[in-house]
From Swiss-Prot:
Domain of life: Bacteria
Name of the protein in question: Putative phosphoenolpyruvate synthase regulatory protein
EC numbers: 2.7.11.33, 2.7.4.28
InterPro entries: Kinase-pyrophosphorylase (IPR005177), PSRP (IPR026530)
Species the sequence originates in: Pseudoalteromonas atlantica (strain T6c / ATCC BAA-1087)
GO molecular function terms noted in the UniProt entry: ADP binding; ATP binding; phosphotransferase activity, phosphate group as acceptor; protein serine/threonine kinase activity
Cross-referenced Pfam families: Kinase-PPPase
Keywords: Kinase, Nucleotide-binding, Serine/threonine-protein kinase, Transferase
Keyword Aminoacyl-tRNA synthetase in record: no
Function text: Bifunctional serine/threonine kinase and phosphorylase involved in the regulation of the phosphoenolpyruvate synthase (PEPS) by catalyzing its phosphorylation/dephosphorylation.
Classification of source organism: Bacteria, Pseudomonadati, Pseudomonadota, Gammaproteobacteria, Alteromonadales
Length: 270
């Protein structure tokens, strides 16, 4: 197994995102080690020592992805035995040439509370939590989007990801067996918000597996029940012309990106 380090003088989120994106292209198993807030030369030396230990243990040079502003700290990391990828050097220098202005790197700027849209993200997260699972319908006027679907189809994690990553206020509403009766109809409380709605669906077998982890051997988790509920919600989506997505084979990140591409919603984070 190859070891990959993600190092930064901040949260290391940027290093992780870039590094994971690159490594996901390879069918190799990695041990991922994240080291945030490396801000002093002494801390950098400790990290270099740890990289050397990984090399001795694995017999392979670790991959080292890092974003560090301080020049001296960066030099120390660059001298590790790992195969080093300095994202600042890789991308910033060419951008300075293209843009015609020098960069002004600052620690913690990318993911800090001083980021001007920080409050937007926090407000969106609070909104998603307060409007989870059909609660607070009176606040739906504020929603940028309302995710609908059967229980355990991915509405809550997607709502939270949209809030945290994009600053989007996402409410979610579950269609339950009680809503269905003989046939599922649009709940009266949702009719005025139809233009904000986006549906999630999922393969019945996968829904059965997810529900069984929560309530094994229950009617709620039975394959027959899952098939019935999914059939009803998909019929409603088509009848009401609600855009929808089958989430079975997608990650939360992919689901969120597809929702934005389909609806035209714009991120508010930057």
């Amino acid at each position: 197994m190859r070891t990959a380090y993600y190092i930064s003088d901040g949260t290391a989120i940027t290093s992780e995102v870039f590094g994971h994106a690159l490594l996901s292209l390879f069918t190799i198993e990695f041990e991922h080690i994240t080291v945030p807030f490396v801000e002093t030369e002494e801390q950098a030396k400790q990290v270099v020592k740890k990289i050397s230990e990984s090399f001795q243990d694995d017999g392979q040079r670790p991959l080292v992805f890092y974003t560090i502003v301080n020049t001296e700290v960066r030099k120390i990391i660059s001298k590790s035995v790992g195969i080093n990828y300095n994202f600042l050097d890789q991308f910033v220098a060419p951008l300075e040439i293209v843009l015609g202005v020098p960069s002004k790197p600052e620690k913690h700027r990318t993911h800090s509370i001083h980021e001007k849209t920080y409050d937007i993200r926090i407000e969106a997260v609070n909104y998603a939590l307060a409007n989870d699972d059909g609660s607070n319908l009176q606040e739906y006027d504020e929603a940028d989007i309302i995710l609908v679907g059967v229980s355990r189809s991915g509405k809550t994690p997607t709502s939270l990801y949209l809030a945290l990553q994009y600053g989007i206020k996402a409410a979610n509403y579950p269609f339950t067996e009680e809503d269905m009766g003989d046939i599922l109809k649009m709940p009266p409380a949702l009719k005025r918000y139809k233009d904000k709605m986006f549906g999630l669906t999922i393969e019945a077998q996968r829904l059965h597996q997810i529900r069984s982890e929560r309530r094994a051997n229950s009617r709620y988790a039975s394959l027959q029940q899952c098939r019935m509920e999914l059939r009803e919600v998909e019929n409603l989506y088509r009848k009401e012309k609600i855009p929808f997505l089958n989430s079975t084979r997608y990650s939360i990140e992919e689901i969120s990106a597809k929702i934005l591409a389909t609806t035209g919603l714009q991120r508010k984070k930057y």
